[in-house]
Design a protein with these regions (language model features):
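Active-site mouth of glycoside hydrolases
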Residues: 1-191
Length: 192
């Protein structure tokens, strides 16, 4: 697989097609991308001027933004590739500098259900997390709620995992959870 974290957020359709053609030529079968990106993902519009959420509310998605996500998933599918789809980068789950996180257990469930329903028939592998470890019980609860929402929406028919930081595996937190299809061990972002 390849990582194109900012794919939905930065590129236009022509650039997306070029990128996917290039990855297909190189033999990639999975492209990982995040819907709510880490780098100004809530405040900077995509190439077509759309923000992902209405008033930063995860229970209200912006249709124009998600039409581009739909486009990417369809175009990848035409090339025999699945999308490793991260609903959000983990920075939106972590409280920082006294500021509340975007997600709480309730809106994480609703957001997950919206996405699970929307993409239940698509070639998607769900990847929660985003280069962060689960540090607090509240973070754990938020990820659990999002996973439950996705499974409610898609009927539990798609693979799902969690993307931790480097040299750590998702099994530390979620190995025995019914929604976890496989563990992810990130080999990058650490010194040898």
């Amino acid at each position: 697989g390849d990582t194109a974290w900012e794919l939905f957020h930065v590129l236009d359709k022509e650039e997306i097609v070029h990128y996917l053609d290039n990855r297909q030529e190189k033999g990639f079968t999975v492209i990982q991308a995040v819907i709510l990106s880490e780098l100004d993902g809530l405040d900077k519009p995509n190439a077509y001027g759309y923000l992902p959420l209405v008033d930063k509310d995860p229970t209200q998605i912006t249709e124009g933004y998600f039409e581009l996500v739909d486009f990417v998933i369809r175009e990848a599918g035409k090339r025999g590739m699945d999308i490793g789809l991260l609903p959000t980068w983990a920075n939106n789950v972590v409280e920082k500098d006294g500021n509340p996180a975007l997600f709480n257990p309730d809106n994480a469930y609703t957001y997950g259900k919206i996405l699970g329903t929307r993409y239940k028939n698509e070639a998607v592998i769900w990847i929660l997390g985003g280069d962060r470890n689960v540090v607090t019980d509240k973070e754990f609860e938020i990820w659990q709620s999002m996973a439950k929402g996705i499974q409610e929406g898609n009927g539990g028919t798609q693979l799902m995992s969690y993307h931790p930081t480097g040299e750590i595996s998702s099994h530390y937190w979620f190995h025995n959870e019914s929604w976890l299809s496989f563990n992810i061990l990130q080999s990058g972002h650490y010194r040898r």
